[in-house]
């Protein structure tokens, strides 16, 4: 036992010269991909004790980490295209990280690899430490571990080992007996030699016998046996050498037989273990094959939420999967909106309208409407003319309004190449396919006719930001950046993210105008013109792709005379709507996806918005 302990102790010692120092700890700010809504966010990352942890900021480290992963079996993969990005994956968990520049990325990757190497999966010193622990355990447990595991079902082998212990004791006793015999013999020989030497010295003075050749010869032959009688060692006469020999032969034969039996048992055990090993190998082969098939299937499907599958120049998602993902996200938004609308209807309580004059607010501008009579006309509405409001974008607004009035109201026939994509009742949606540098710039034109509302009412609800969230379901948030005039504002708005497409934002000037009629037969016309501008208060940001728009909502009111002397009611009015949209979405969304989404969403928008205006104006005085 002492030998085993000493061997284990020596084997567990490590060479201090080859033992490397602990890996260096590291901390700093990295951009981490949080989710498809918020995208990349700066996080305080700490690399310590083979663990990578991240916090929301350096000041919040005392509140605990937001997440951590062990680097023992982590796979670090620098990105192929993004020189600042690297991914860390452990089983199904993947962290997407970005450094400030390629140099910082390499420093982080090297530090993480060093921690991973020293974690026990790849370090020679770690392998030595693990081996030493195994040897200590095996040396300390001895036969007890063997008897409780490998020999749990092999009692015959243990019995044979006990027999060999008995044979060893017999052989040891025989060796002790022989050793005693040899020791006594050695003592007897030593005493005999001393006695012989003494007798020879006493007889040196005796006369020698004279031979015929004159030489002298001592007469010792006749007295030799008398002088040196045969000495027999005392105390060994009781040894039965023949019996000991028989016992020795039987003992060795028993040892050989027992060893043979032990070998036979071990061979049988080895065959049993070999069969179990073969079965486990076959199971492992089947599992690995199934795992390989699953991984191949997973490679075919996008990892939802990962930055590699979002919109971008190096996106791994194909157009079909891109469209499926966008369509699924839009369906979810529609369901949420339906639930929200049903909840609003359930909680809605009608409010009474005050009698007398009705006031309608358009921004901060006020219109006063008197009850309409046959003697009155549309020009009886007191309106501050839009041309009286002058601001730094006035010339651009005038140009945009004139262009839309000249071109947007033209017929879709001729050489314009307008394609009818949707037709539902009075609503028709046309499109012209235009691409520039791979970006879809399809102009869209829709015509619609809505009963019971005026063009002024439709444009009022379309322009007024106070009611924007009541009918617009695609906006995440918005705010008025600057009020240029009573009828012109600059608005910044961000649209809801539809994964895997990038989030879009828009900065645009919105102006509402009444277009004077050139003749008595011309219908009353209102227009809302929205077009992109630049403003210092809303610069570009990395979270959103800035879209460029040029949109016009042109509404003409047609009145059919009532019968007799009756006043005009909503049954006598019809609003003819022309909606024109020129949108540059930017980014890298596939053209087929953008066209499919536009074909789906624009008709839904017109129906939803016009239904909202009809609902809000029902039962209210007409606003011409």
Curated annotation (Swiss-Prot):
- Species the sequence originates in: Mus musculus
Q: Where in the cell is it found?
A: Cytoplasm; Golgi apparatus; Endoplasmic reticulum
Compositional bias ranges of the Polar residues kind: 1-11
* Residue ranges that the Swiss-Prot or TrEMBL entry lists as coiled coil: 263-303
* SMART domains xrefs: PH (SM00233), START (SM00234)
Annotated PROSITE patterns: PH_DOMAIN (PS50003), START (PS50848)
Residue positions of motif FFAT = 321-327
The free-text domain note is:
The START domain recognizes ceramides and diacylglycerol lipids, interacts with membranes, and mediates the intermembrane transfer of ceramides and diacylglycerol lipids. The PH domain targets the Golgi apparatus.
Per its UniProt record, what Pfam families does this chain match?
A: PH, START
- PH domain residues are 23-117
Q: Which reaction does it catalyse?
A: N-hexadecanoylsphing-4-enine(in) = N-hexadecanoylsphing-4-enine(out)
Report the protein name in the record.
Ceramide transfer protein
Q: What does this protein do?
A: Shelters ceramides and diacylglycerol lipids inside its START domain and mediates the intracellular trafficking of ceramides and diacylglycerol lipids in a non-vesicular manner.
């Amino acid at each position: 036992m002492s030998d085993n302990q000493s061997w284990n102790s020596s084997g567990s010692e490590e060479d201090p010269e080859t033992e490397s120092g602990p890996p260096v700890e590291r901390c700093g700010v990295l951009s981490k991909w949080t989710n498809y809504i918020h995208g990349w966010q700066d996080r305080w990352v700490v690399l310590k004790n083979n663990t990578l942890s991240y916090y929301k900021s350096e000041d919040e480290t005392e509140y605990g980490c937001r997440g951590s992963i062990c680097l023992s079996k982590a796979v670090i993969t620098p990105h192929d295209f993004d020189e600042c990005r690297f991914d860390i994956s452990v089983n199904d968990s993947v962290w997407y990280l970005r450094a400030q520049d390629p140099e910082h990325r390499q420093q982080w990757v090297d530090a993480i690899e060093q921690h991973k190497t020293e974690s026990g999966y790849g370090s020679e010193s770690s392998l030595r430490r693990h081996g030493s622990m195994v040897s200590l355990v095996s040396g300390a447990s001895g036969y007890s571990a063997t008897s409780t595991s490998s020999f749990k079902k092999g009692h015959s082998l243990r019995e044979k080992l006990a027999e060999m212990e008995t044979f060893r004791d017999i052989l040891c006793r025989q060796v002790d007996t022989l050793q005693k015999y040899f020791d006594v013999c050695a003592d007897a020989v030593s005493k005999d030699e001393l006695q012989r030497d003494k007798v020879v010295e006493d007889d040196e003075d005796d006369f020698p016998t004279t031979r015929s050749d004159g030489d002298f010869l001592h007469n010792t032959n006749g007295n030799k046996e008398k002088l040196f009688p045969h000495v027999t060692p005392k105390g060994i006469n009781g040894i039965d050498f023949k019996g000991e020999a028989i016992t020795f032969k039987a003992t060795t034969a028993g040892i050989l037989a027992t060893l043979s039996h032990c070998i036979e048992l071990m061979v049988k055990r080895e065959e049993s273990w070999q069969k179990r090993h073969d079965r486990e190998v076959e199971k492992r082969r089947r599992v690995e094959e199934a795992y390989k098939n699953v991984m191949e299937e997973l490679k075919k499907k996008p990892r939802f939420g990962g930055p590699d599958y979002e919109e971008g120049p190096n996106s791994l998602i194909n157009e079909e999967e891109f469209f499926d993902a966008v369509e699924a996200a839009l369906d979810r938004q529609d369901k949420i909106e339906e639930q929200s609308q049903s909840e609003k209807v359930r909680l809605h309580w009608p409010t009474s309208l005050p009698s007398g004059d009705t006031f309608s607010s358009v921004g901060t501008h006020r219109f006063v409407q008197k009850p309409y009579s046959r003697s009155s006309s549309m020009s009886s509405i007191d309106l501050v003319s839009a041309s009286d409001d002058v601001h730094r974008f006035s010339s651009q607004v005038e140009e945009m309004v004139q262009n839309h009035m000249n071109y947007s109201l033209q017929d879709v026939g001729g050489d314009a190449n307008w394609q009818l994509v949707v037709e539902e009742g009075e609503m028709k949606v046309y499109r012209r396919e235009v691409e520039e540098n791979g970006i879809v710039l399809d102009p869209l034109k829709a015509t619609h006719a809505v009963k019971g509302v005026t063009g002024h009412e439709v444009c009022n609800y379309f322009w007024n930001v106070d009611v924007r969230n009541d009918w617009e379901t695609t906006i995440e948030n918005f705010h008025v950046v600057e009020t240029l005039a009573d009828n012109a504002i600059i608005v910044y708005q961000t649209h809801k993210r539809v994964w895997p497409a990038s989030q879009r934002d828009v900065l645009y000037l919105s102006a509402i105008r009444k277009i004077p009629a050139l003749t008595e037969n011309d219908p009353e016309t209102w227009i809302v013109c929205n077009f992109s501008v630049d403003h210092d208060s809303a610069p570009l940001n990395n979270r959103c792709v800035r879209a460029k728009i040029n949109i016009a909502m042109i509404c003409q009111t047609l009145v059919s005379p009532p019968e007799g002397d009756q006043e005009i009611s909503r049954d006598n009015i019809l609003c003819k709507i022309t909606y024109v949209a020129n949108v540059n979405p930017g980014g890298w969304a596939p053209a087929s996806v953008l066209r499919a989404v536009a074909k789906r969403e624009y008709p839904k928008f017109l129906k939803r918005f016009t239904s909202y205006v009809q609902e809000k104006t029902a039962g209210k005085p007409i606003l011409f």
